[in-house]
Amino acid sequence: MNLAVQSLAENSETGMTQLSDTVFTQHFNEPLIHQVVTAYLAKARAGTHAQKTRSEARGGGAKPFRQKGTGRARAGTIRSPLWRGGGRAFAAKPGDYSQKVNRKMYRAAMRSILSELVRQDRLRMIDKIMLSKPKTRDLAKLLKPITWRSVLIVVAEDDRNLELSARNIPTVAIRNVSRVSPVELIRFDGVLVTGDAIRCFEESLT
């Protein structure tokens, strides 16, 4: 398929480029995308939550009152889950929430996401984006014609000036094509991809 190449500096189309049908014309596989995105979000969980059971709560070794004759319900410890300050009945413990996603599933999900972004006109190809120095104002000026509320810019190589310029714009993110995740592709309203990054996608996902 063909995709227009846009110039941010001139705010116009500079030509057309041929995209790989293997990567950019796949059907929308929602169950697979859901599984991969869920795995990414699960792996991001710290899993450090911890609560104390009745045996771990400090104190409570002595029986609070005698078994019979008080009229109260019997109790053997003040750290029972029924008591204020007691341990939790089903205490949360640190755990690993990561899920396995093999390479074949990941590549298929990425192809499906990229194809759907192209169909929805949420992925646009730009010729290049370069800044001579880190300046937020310069980057904001380049992106001013873009109507998306949030923009993900995918580049082939790390650009320190570009990253520093976008750091103070909360709705803009810069990602290297090798580090972009399915979650980020879905989360942003639109994705700008350089020509070199498009070729990297085609090489890595075929």
Curated annotation (Swiss-Prot):
<comment type="subunit">
    <text>Part of the 50S ribosomal subunit.</text>
</comment>
<dbReference type="Pfam" id="PF00573">
    <property type="entry name" value="Ribosomal_L4"/>
</dbReference>
<dbReference type="GO" id="GO:1990904">
    <property type="term" value="C:ribonucleoprotein complex"/>
</dbReference>
<dbReference type="GO" id="GO:0005840">
    <property type="term" value="C:ribosome"/>
</dbReference>
<keyword id="KW-0687">Ribonucleoprotein</keyword>
<comment type="similarity">
    <text>Belongs to the universal ribosomal protein uL4 family.</text>
</comment>
<dbReference type="InterPro" id="IPR013005">
    <property type="entry name" value="Ribosomal_uL4-like"/>
</dbReference>
<dbReference type="GO" id="GO:0003735">
    <property type="term" value="F:structural constituent of ribosome"/>
</dbReference>
<feature type="region of interest" description="Disordered">
    <location>
        <begin position="48"/>
        <end position="78"/>
    </location>
</feature>
<dbReference type="InterPro" id="IPR002136">
    <property type="entry name" value="Ribosomal_uL4"/>
</dbReference>
<dbReference type="GO" id="GO:0006412">
    <property type="term" value="P:translation"/>
</dbReference>
<comment type="function">
    <text>Forms part of the polypeptide exit tunnel.</text>
</comment>
<comment type="function">
    <text>One of the primary rRNA binding proteins, this protein initially binds near the 5'-end of the 23S rRNA. It is important during the early stages of 50S assembly. It makes multiple contacts with different domains of the 23S rRNA in the assembled 50S subunit and ribosome.</text>
</comment>
<protein>
    <recommendedName>
        <fullName>Large ribosomal subunit protein uL4</fullName>
    </recommendedName>
</protein>
<keyword id="KW-0689">Ribosomal protein</keyword>
<keyword id="KW-0699">rRNA-binding</keyword>
<dbReference type="GO" id="GO:0019843">
    <property type="term" value="F:rRNA binding"/>
</dbReference>
<keyword id="KW-0694">RNA-binding</keyword>
<dbReference type="InterPro" id="IPR023574">
    <property type="entry name" value="Ribosomal_uL4_dom_sf"/>
</dbReference>
